[in-house]
Amino acid sequence: DDGEPQGTAGIPVFDVLRKRNLTDVCIVVTRYFGGILLGGGGLVRAYSHCASITCDSAEIMNMCHCTRINISVDYSVYGKISYIIPRYEVITVSSDFGDKINLELLVTDESRENLCKELVNISNGNITIEYKEELFEDFSSVKK
């Protein structure tokens, strides 16, 4: 509310974000004209409207902390694991079908432990899982 009547800028913008359940967001609004003419109610409506149209036009992303993992399995196990993987929050980065099947996956922290346990169980331990770097990636396209 820097330079504005108290409660007429920051709180209305924050209310828009809260109602849309958005976090880790920054909205900057610059007003050039109309403070005295608009009055307190007009300022609240102006700032709220600005935040709303900004949110409407923004691409909303679901950023998740995740781990890049590499999986190597025999062809005999691939059908089973290809059934399991989509049940978790996973992005397939690449797949290579050579002597073995090698998959590079991004797995959310919430899914990683259970997914890896299930992959080991379903493959009877005939799987290699390599944990790589931890990342922060957009999982908006992944259905929960």
Q: Where does each model-flagged region fall?
A:
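Portal/gating segments that form or line small-molecule/metal binding sites
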Residues: 1-22
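Stable alpha-helical structural segments in soluble proteins, enriched in small hydrophobic residues
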Residues: 46, 50-58
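Short glycine-/aliphatic-rich beta-strand segments at the starts of folded cytosolic domains
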Residues: 59-77, 103
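Short amphipathic alpha-helix segments
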Residues: 71-90
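Helix N-cap motif at beta-to-alpha junctions
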Residues: 74-78, 108-113
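A common structural junction motif
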Residues: 88-93, 120-128
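Short proline/glycine- and acidic-rich turn/helix-capping motifs at secondary-structure junctions
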Residues: 97-110, 131-144
